């Protein structure tokens, strides 16, 4: 996490650079786009009342005018993240590059409803433009490491080896798929509205879909910004200002009233990049934290060699021997 925050801090432009990149006209144009999305939603007016004040021989009336439909605190936070994400100047994925990421995950099963088991994983991936992914996965407690290729053959030495013809989707986006998504909140909402499924409510399904896109780290800056703008329109989404290793962050959450589970996504307030996701339910809790996310031109030779020396679907001990079942 520290390495990722350091990279994000380095990547973030200075205030002088931001002012140069974001002229008053450009900032106003983006704000106008956000307000257009907000204004398109049905307003919920709150009407004031007339209060009669009687004093001696005179009667006066105080009328409270109809209140403006102001954005919620969550919507304000999310639109701020959208502005930040749109101005992010880090490297952007394109054909010929790889997304290199490191992450850790912890699942804790309930001691009351389950066996209380704890599962830890460390993952390192290299994802190509078309979705071909090299995955190194480790279990620190069990002491094993595996080397698998997702959506592609093990011809690692051939950088042009094609990915398998597995269709990408909003649930499993490739960089190529993400680049073609709508880059406005209205467009994203329209695209997802008829596609999301499998949840206890449409709002929860939309939240999960938008968070899944954001946490993939495959979205171009404008599309990531549109994702936050879209989340600002989903009923039930909450935000909380938190700190991660001393740095300001925003926790974006949604509670499923039917199951009681709570999903959260933690976003770096300075860059708009996703740091972690978490799901809490009565059965278990699951947290996945991204510790490194960067765009690289190629896979290191040592990694290519490691995949050439290890077989698919085999777990290896620290000494490099296959584990016995």
Locate predicted features.
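Intrinsically disordered, low-complexity prosegments and terminal tails associated
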Residues: 52-325
């Amino acid at each position: 996490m520290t390495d990722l925050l350091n990279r994000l801090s380095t990547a973030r432009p200075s205030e002088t650079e931001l002012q140069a990149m974001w002229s008053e006209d450009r900032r106003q144009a983006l704000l106008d786009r956000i307000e257009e999305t907000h204004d398109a939603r049905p307003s919920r007016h709150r009407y004031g009342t007339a209060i009669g004040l009687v004093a001696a021989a005179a009667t006066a009336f105080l009328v409270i005018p109809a209140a403006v439909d102001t954005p919620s605190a969550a919507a304000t936070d999310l639109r701020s993240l959208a502005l930040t994400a749109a101005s992010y100047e880090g490297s952007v994925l394109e054909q010929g590059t790889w997304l290199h990421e490191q992450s850790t995950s912890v699942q804790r099963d309930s001691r009351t409803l389950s066996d209380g088991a704890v599962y830890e994983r460390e993952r390192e991936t290299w994802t190509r433009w078309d979705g071909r992914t090299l995955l190194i996965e480790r279990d620190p407690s069990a002491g094993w490491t595996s080397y698998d290729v997702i959506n592609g053959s093990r011809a690692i030495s051939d950088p042009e080896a094609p990915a398998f013809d597995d269709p990408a989707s909003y649930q499993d986006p490739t960089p190529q798929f993400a680049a073609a998504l709508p880059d406005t909140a209205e467009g994203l909402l329209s695209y997802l509205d008829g596609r999301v499924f499998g949840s206890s409510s449409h709002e929860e399904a939309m939240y999960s879909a938008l968070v899944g896109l954001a946490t993939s780290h495959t979205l171009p800056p404008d599309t990531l910004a549109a994702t936050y703008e879209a989340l600002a329109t989903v009923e039930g989404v909450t935000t909380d200002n938190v700190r991660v290793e001393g740095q300001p962050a925003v926790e974006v959450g949604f509670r499923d009233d039917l199951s009681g589970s709570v999903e959260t996504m933690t976003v770096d307030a300075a860059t708009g990049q996703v740091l972690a996701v978490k799901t809490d339910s009565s059965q278990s809790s699951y947290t996945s934290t991204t510790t490194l996310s960067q765009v690289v031109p190629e896979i290191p030779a040592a990694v290519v060699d490691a995949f050439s020396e290890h077989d698919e679907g085999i777990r290896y001990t620290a000494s490099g021997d296959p584990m016995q079942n």
